[in-house]
């Protein structure tokens, strides 16, 4: 699972989900990518599930890059606990994703297999995504 090794503060405020991505919105490493179309918190489990979906479909060959990292903790108090008495424990780690962000990149010789693998990975994510190609970028 993807979690930070060490953080300065264990509990943080929730990040803002408004606006568009300022960086990371172009394919830099691979030939194909998954781009977010709406804001979302993507957990470490969802990232891992999408990565496994890509690797299972392509079997051998190619390379996958994960461009997001879940560096923000989300806390939650237990069910049935009254208000007050401090912030709850860390429940999960999330990556704050804004529209336009490239989430995954991939290089693979066969275009049809690569696009199908990215489509399957996009179904594991909690936001609307689209598949982009490097040559389509301007």
Curated annotation (Swiss-Prot):
Establish whether keyword Metal-binding is in the entry.
no
| Residue ranges with Basic residues bias | 1-19
List, in alphabetical order, the Gene Ontology terms for molecular function in this entry. Answer: rRNA binding; structural constituent of ribosome; tRNA binding
Q: InterPro entries, per this entry?
A: Ribosomal_uL16, Ribosomal_uL16_bact-type, Ribosomal_uL16_CS, Ribosomal_uL16_dom, Ribosomal_uL16_sf
- PROSITE patterns per UniProt: RIBOSOMAL_L16_1, RIBOSOMAL_L16_2
Alphabetical keyword list: Ribonucleoprotein, Ribosomal protein, RNA-binding, rRNA-binding, tRNA-binding
- What interactions and quaternary structure are annotated? Part of the 50S ribosomal subunit.
- The protein here is known as Large ribosomal subunit protein uL16
**Lineage per the UniProt record:** Bacteria, Bacillati, Actinomycetota, Actinomycetes, Mycobacteriales
């Amino acid at each position: 699972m993807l979690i930070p090794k060490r953080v300065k503060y264990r509990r943080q405020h929730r990040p803002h989900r408004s606006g568009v991505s300022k960086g990371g919105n172009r394919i830099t490493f691979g030939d194909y990518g998954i781009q977010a179309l709406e804001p979302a918190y993507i957990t470490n489990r969802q990232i891992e599930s999408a990565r496994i979906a890509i690797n299972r479909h392509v079997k051998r060959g190619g390379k996958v890059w994960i461009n997001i990292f879940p560096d923000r903790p989300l806390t939650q108090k237990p069910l049935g606990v009254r208000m007050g008495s401090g912030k709850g424990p860390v429940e999960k780690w999330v990556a704050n994703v804004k529209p336009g962000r490239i989430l995954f990149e991939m290089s693979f010789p066969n275009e049809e297999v690569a696009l199908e693998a990215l489509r399957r990975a996009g179904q594991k994510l909690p936001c609307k995504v689209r598949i982009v190609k490097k040559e389509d970028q301007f």
